[in-house]
């Protein structure tokens, strides 16, 4: 199994390790709920070095990414980041990712751990007609520093000058400090940063964060946090069999420049014209029980919906899920252990900055 540069730190902290996409990763350090609540109320840190930063450089870097991605990087200013999907020719989602614009000729993309090899292969396969160099940065580590006190913690571990610049970063902005890249992004619905830095320096950084008030958090808390925030998990909520239209991600597909072609555009426009017969929703179970991926949602007209992600919400203290359901259907119920339980359909976003949205 693959190990991140912080593997020994996780073992020393008595983390429970699991196999995640071939990587030995911490699921928790004792209490997933405590780790979750700490990110909502204070500051938690995550090792996400199993994800991969890929640099796209060259005179046609922007031109290439305008073709590769469904969102339009031409809209990006330097030191800004953009969420988007990478589609195949059928408009199926190959991955969802964040693109960072360093300069007109240098972009950085962070890809999901389970798609590292396939994404890089897809980049290379589609880059042949462009003047670009694609460089997977395998010698970098990534640490997410998340929570309302993330700024306070990170300020304690860097110089005053750097602290001021980090604090001034706006959401979806980033800055390089030598080989370190600090972005005001995250996967929790809280304020925070993702720090991409040389693997040789990550242990010292991790330890100093812990010494200055941060608590480690595992992938278990990361999953419940992102679910509460209504953020998609690739491989669970969407994959190559789904288009952005069916998963509430149409907003991330930029069609404003009709002259721009991108992979999957033709199929996407056809699907858009045809219309989709499902909608992307949040699900709340008000009674006792747990919502899980794969569960059916039954409606009184005989139609069905399906939950793609589900869990107990530590913040709301109820079971929540993300699901696709028929556009027109009433009285949704889920079947749990032979009992039909009523669920409420809500907007697919439950918590932001520690506050309930439902």
UniProtKB/Swiss-Prot annotation:
InterPro entries: GCS_T (IPR006223), GCS_T_bac (IPR022903), GCST_C (IPR013977), GCV_T_N (IPR006222), GcvT/YgfZ/DmdA (IPR028896), GcvT/YgfZ_C (IPR029043), TrmE/GcvT_dom1 (IPR027266). GO terms for biological process: glycine decarboxylation via glycine cleavage system. It catalyses: N(6)-[(R)-S(8)-aminomethyldihydrolipoyl]-L-lysyl-[protein] + (6S)-5,6,7,8-tetrahydrofolate = N(6)-[(R)-dihydrolipoyl]-L-lysyl-[protein] + (6R)-5,10-methylene-5,6,7,8-tetrahydrofolate + NH4(+). One of its GO terms (molecular function) is transaminase activity. It comes from the Bacteria. Gene3D superfamilies: Aminomethyltransferase beta-barrel domains (3.30.70.1400), Aminomethyltransferase fragment (4.10.1250.10), Probable tRNA modification gtpase trme, domain 1 (3.30.1360.120). Its EC number is 2.1.2.10. The keyword Transferase applies. Keywords: Aminotransferase, Transferase. One of its GO terms (cellular component) is cytosol. Belongs to the GcvT family. The glycine cleavage system catalyzes the degradation of glycine. HAMAP family: GcvT (MF_00259). The glycine cleavage system is composed of four proteins: P, T, L and H. This is Aminomethyltransferase.
């Amino acid at each position: 199994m693959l190990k991140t540069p912080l593997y020994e730190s996780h073992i020393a902290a008595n983390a429970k390790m699991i196999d995640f996409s071939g990587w030995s990763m911490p699921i928790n350090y004792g209490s997933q709920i405590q780790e979750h609540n700490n990110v909502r109320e204070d500051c938690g840190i995550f090792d996400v070095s199993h994800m991969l930063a890929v640099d796209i450089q060259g005179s046609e870097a922007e031109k290439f990414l305008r073709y590769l991605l469904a969102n339009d990087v031409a809209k990006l200013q330097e030191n800004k980041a953009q969420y988007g999907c990478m589609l195949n020719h059928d408009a199926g989602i190959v991955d969802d990712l964040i693109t960072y614009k360093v300069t007109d000729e240098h972009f950085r993309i962070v890809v999901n751990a389970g798609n590292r090899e396939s994404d890089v292969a897809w980049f290379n396969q589609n880059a042949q007609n462009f003047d670009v160099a694609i460089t997977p940065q395998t010698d970098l580590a990534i640490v997410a520093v998340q929570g309302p006190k993330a700024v306070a913690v990170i300020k304690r571990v860097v110089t005053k000058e750097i602290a001021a610049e980090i604090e001034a970063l706006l959401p979806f902005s980033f800055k390089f400090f030598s080989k370190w890249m600090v972005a005001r992004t995250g996967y929790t619905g809280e304020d925070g940063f993702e720090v991409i830095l040389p693997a040789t320096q990550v242990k010292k950084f991790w330890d100093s964060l812990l010494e200055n008030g941060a608590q480690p958090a595992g992938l278990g808390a990361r999953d419940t946090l992102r679910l509460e925030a209504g953020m998609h998990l690739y491989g669970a909520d969407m994959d190559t069999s789904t288009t952005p239209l069916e998963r509430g991600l149409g907003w991330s597909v930029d069609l404003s420049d009709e002259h721009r072609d991108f992979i999957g555009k033709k199929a996407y426009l056809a699907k858009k014209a045809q219309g989709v017969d499902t909608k992307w929703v949040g699900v709340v179970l008000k009674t006792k029980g747990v919502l899980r991926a794969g569960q059916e949602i039954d409606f009184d007209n005989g139609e069905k919906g399906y939950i793609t992600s589900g869990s107990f919400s530590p913040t709301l203290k109820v079971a929540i899920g993300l699901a696709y359901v028929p556009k027109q259907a009433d009285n949704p119920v889920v079947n749990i252990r032979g009992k039909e339980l009523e669920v409420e359909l809500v907007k697919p976003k439950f918590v932001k900055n520690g506050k309930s949205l439902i």
